[in-house]
From Swiss-Prot:
Reaction catalysed by this enzyme: a 3-demethylubiquinol + S-adenosyl-L-methionine = a ubiquinol + S-adenosyl-L-homocysteine + H(+); a 3-(all-trans-polyprenyl)benzene-1,2-diol + S-adenosyl-L-methionine = a 2-methoxy-6-(all-trans-polyprenyl)phenol + S-adenosyl-L-homocysteine + H(+)
Enzyme class: transferase
Primary role: O-methyltransferase that catalyzes the 2 O-methylation steps in the ubiquinone biosynthetic pathway.
GO molecular function: 2-polyprenyl-6-hydroxyphenol methylase activity; 3-demethylubiquinol 3-O-methyltransferase activity; polyprenyldihydroxybenzoate methyltransferase activity
SUPFAM superfamilies reported for this sequence: S-adenosyl-L-methionine-dependent methyltransferases (SSF53335)
Protein species of origin: Thiobacillus denitrificans (strain ATCC 25259 / T1)
Pathway where this protein functions: Cofactor biosynthesis; ubiquinone biosynthesis
E.C. number: 2.1.1.222, 2.1.1.64
Binding-site positions, S-adenosyl-L-methionine: 36, 55, 76, 120
Any Gene Ontology biological process: methylation
Protein name: Ubiquinone biosynthesis O-methyltransferase
Family the entry assigns: Belongs to the methyltransferase superfamily. UbiG/COQ3 family.
Taxonomic placement: Bacteria, Pseudomonadati, Pseudomonadota, Betaproteobacteria, Nitrosomonadales
Pfam families xref list: Methyltransf_23 (PF13489)
Keywords: Methyltransferase, S-adenosyl-L-methionine, Transferase, Ubiquinone biosynthesis
Amino acid sequence: MSNVDAAEIAKFSELAHRWWDPNSEFKPLHEINPLRLRWVDTRAPLAGKKVLDVGCGGGILAEAMAGVGATVSGIDLSEKALKVARLHLYESGKSVDYELVSAEDYAAAHPGEFDVVTCMEMLEHVPDPASVVAACARLVKPGGWVFFSTLNRNAKSYLLAVVGAEYILKLLPRGTHDYAKFIKPAELARMAREAGLETEELTGMTYNPLTKVYRLEADTDVNYLMATRREA
C-alpha cells in the first residue's frame, strides 16, 4: 500500500461519479477505449481468457474486455471509482470482479493467475511505476501478455499532453498530469525487462485537434502503448 499517491487517488475519486459520462472529464478515455481494446485483442485474443485490469478506475476498459468474452477482474485504490464501476454493471449487464487493492498486494495473493494483464494510463500516477510493472509481471502466467500505456517525457509531450490538453483544448482538467512522472519508452522497457517481461511492440497514439480523432500510429512522442510478454 506504500506505492500510492494520496493526492492522485483523491483527484480521481472526486470525479468518480462522472466516469461513465462520455461528455465529462473522462471523454478522452471513452474515445480511446475502442482503440485500446482492439489493439489488445488483436495481439492477445481476449475471448475465454482470464484478464486483469490494473488501475481500472470506473471500469471503462474492464467492461469492454468483458464484452468480448474475457473473464475480467479489475483492481484500483479509489473506493469511489470502484463503487461507480460496480453500479454500472447493473446497467450494462456485464460481469467484472472489482477489488480495492494495490497491484503489489494483489500480486502477492494471485501470482501467475492471468492470461492477460492491462495497465493503461496508470503508471504516470504512482510514485514507483517499476513496482507496479513488477507486480503485473508476477500476476501474468508464463507466456502471458502484459499491456501498458502511458506518456512519454519530452518537450513535445509537455506541450501537447499538459499545456495543450489541459490548458488550451481543455480535454482534461488542469493538474491531471504531472510531467515529472511521465515515462520514456526506454525506461518502461527497462522496467519490464527487469521484471521478466520482453517488449514485443511499441505503438503511438495521436490526437488531431482539428478532426478530434485519435489514431494508433508510429509516433510515440506523446502517448504510447507497449505490449510485453512474460517468458514462458
